[in-house]
Amino acid sequence: MTRRIDILGAGLSGLSAATILSREGYDVHVYEIRADSGARFDGDFQGIENWTSDTDFFDEMREWGFDPEEFKATPFNIIDLIHPDDVITQPSTDKPAFRVVERGTDSHCIDQGFKRMAQAAGATIHYETRKALEECDIIAAGPKESSAIAFGEIFHTDHPNHVSFQLNDKLAPGAYSYLIIIDGIG
């Protein structure tokens, strides 16, 4: 008899676990309170860093059995780094320093790519379903509260893909601000 594994949360962690366990022959069921993976995001951009290791993170993903072609990722090897005195430097690398992905429910988002991989591996995902913590083998439900407040604007532009990272207390006291433009959306 195949062992059943119940996972709470259909975000990236829960879906990753579901994919690996399903491939190993487990009967995996994932429970998600929201209507879809990535539903708590609204087209937010996030960076996946790649500069702290000699091995490209997407190559590591492939070694683990995940296909980074399942979602859109835009590589960057240069960034505008805006210092507190407003001086701009442009650190760069020979390989992608990071990749920008989009979070959400659109088909090109990383959340949807991980959902497709989990389903292809055989996992069953139950959306809009509550499941008690004690009934689950893996808890991957994400944060219950916000740890920061972020303000953002989404706009359309003909500016090329670009990332600026600003360390300036005038704009973001004690924190940072950034600008990301991917395919005409900033």
Where are these regions (language model features)?
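N-terminal FAD cofactor-binding segment of flavoenzymes
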Residues: A35-P84
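Glycine-rich FAD pyrophosphate-binding loop
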Residues: L8-A10, S22-D44
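Short amphipathic beta-strand/extended segments with alternating polar/hydrophobic composition
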Residues: V87-P96, Q166
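Short beta-strand to alpha-helix junction loop
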Residues: T52-T55, T93-R116, S146
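N-terminal Rossmann-fold NAD(P) dinucleotide-binding loop
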Residues: G14-L15
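Predominantly flavin-linked oxidoreductase catalytic cores and closely associated redox partners
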Residues: A10, I20, R34, H108, ...
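Short acidic-glycine loop/turn motifs at beta-strand connectors
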Residues: I82-V87, I182-I185
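Extreme N-terminal starter segment of soluble prokaryotic enzymes
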Residues: M1-D6
